[in-house]
C-alpha cells in the first residue's frame, strides 16, 4: 500500500521565510473575519469560470471619475454620520430641528455668511484623511479577497494532482490484482 510520511524541518530552513526570500508567504486572515470557515477558506473550489478570471491587479486601476465618485459616496456617508451624531446630541440638549430650520431659512443668499461658505474648501484635511483611509481599506479588502481566492484555486489544483498521482502509483504497483486486507 502507498504510504506517505513527512518529517519536520529543522531550524536551519527558517532562512527561507526571511524577508529576502523569494518565496511568498500566505496572507493572514483579516482580524474581523468570521470564526467559521467560509467555502473559500475550506479549499472548496469557487464557481468561477476560467475565462472570467483576470490577473491580479488587472482591473484595479481607478479612473479619475471612479475616484471622484468614491469620494462623493464616502463624503455622503460621512455627512449622514455627522447628521446622526448631531441629531442625537441635539435631542439630548433639547434643541428642536424646527427652530434650526426656521433660523437657517432667515439668512439671505447675499449675506456675508453665505460668502464665507463659498470660500471654504469642500473637505477639511481631516475629512480627506478619513475618506482616503476608507477607500484604501475597501481596496485592500478587495485585493485580499482576490488573493485568497487565487490561493484556494491553486491549492485545489495541487490537491487534485496529488490525488491523481497517488491513484496512479497505487494502480502501477498493484495493477489489476484484487485488494485484500492481508499484505
Swiss-Prot record:
GO cellular component, one term: chromatin
Function: Molecular adapter that acts as a bridge between proteins, and which is involved skeletal muscle development. Functions as a signal transducer for MSTN during skeletal muscle regeneration and myogenesis.
Taxonomic superkingdom: Eukaryota
CDD domains referenced in this protein's UniProt entry, alphabetically: akirin-1
Main location: nucleus
Family listed: Belongs to the akirin family.
Organism: Xenopus laevis
Region (Disordered): 14-43
Gene this protein is translated from: akirin1-b
Record GO terms (molecular function): transcription coregulator activity
Motif SYVS motif boundaries: 180-183
GO biological-process terms attached to the record: myoblast migration involved in skeletal muscle regeneration; negative regulation of skeletal muscle satellite cell proliferation; positive regulation of lamellipodium assembly; positive regulation of macrophage chemotaxis; positive regulation of myoblast differentiation; positive regulation of transcription by RNA polymerase II
Entry protein name: Akirin-1B
Keywords for this protein: Nucleus
Subcellular locations according to the entry: Nucleus
InterPro entries, alphabetized: Akirin (IPR024132)
